[in-house]
């Protein structure tokens, strides 16, 4: 199974925010490492899209979000259709699910 990968605007913004914060607080080297980890994990999803568990927040919005942990602080939130994996958000695991949904544009 090799599905097309699409990135939502909130996913791109959340990744940019994480990388910007990392550069400021920990340096460019760590930010580049995190970016490589995220991109590598996203590419692996195209071959195994159902490998990550369904997120508990799915019930709140009626959409089956899956969450792939990249490292202990970063999680890829995504959905799967017949032809596409949609990267919906790159989550700092310290962020609450409700805050994440708000940033994704869902009113809860």
Give the role of each language-model region.
Residues 39-42:
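Compact soluble domain cores
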Residues 4, 50, 87:
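Contiguous, function-dense segments enriched for cysteine-driven chemistry
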Residues 15-19, 67-69, 84-86:
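A general secondary-structure boundary signal
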Residues 48-83:
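Basic/aromatic recognition patch in beta-strand/loop cores that engages polyanionic ligands
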Residues 14-19, 26-31, 48-51, 56, ...:
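Catalytic cores of transferase enzymes with a strong primary signal for eukaryotic protein kinases
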Residues 70-108:
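Enriched for short, Lys/Arg-rich terminal
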Residues 1-37:
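Arg/Lys-rich, positively charged N-terminal/basic patches that mediate binding to nucleic acids
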């Amino acid at each position: 199974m090799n599905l097309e990968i699409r990135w939502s605007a909130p996913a791109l913004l959340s990744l940019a925010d994480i990388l910007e914060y990392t550069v400021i607080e920990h340096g460019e080297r760590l930010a580049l490492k995190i970016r490589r980890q995220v991109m590598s994990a996203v590419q692996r999803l195209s071959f195994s899209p159902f490998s990550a568990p369904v997120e508990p927040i799915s019930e709140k919005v009626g959409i089956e979000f899956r969450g792939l942990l990249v490292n202990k602080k970063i999680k890829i939130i995504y959905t799967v259709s017949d032809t596409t994996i949609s990267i919906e958000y790159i989550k700092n695991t310290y962020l609450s699910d409700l805050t994440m949904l708000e940033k994704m544009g869902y009113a809860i």
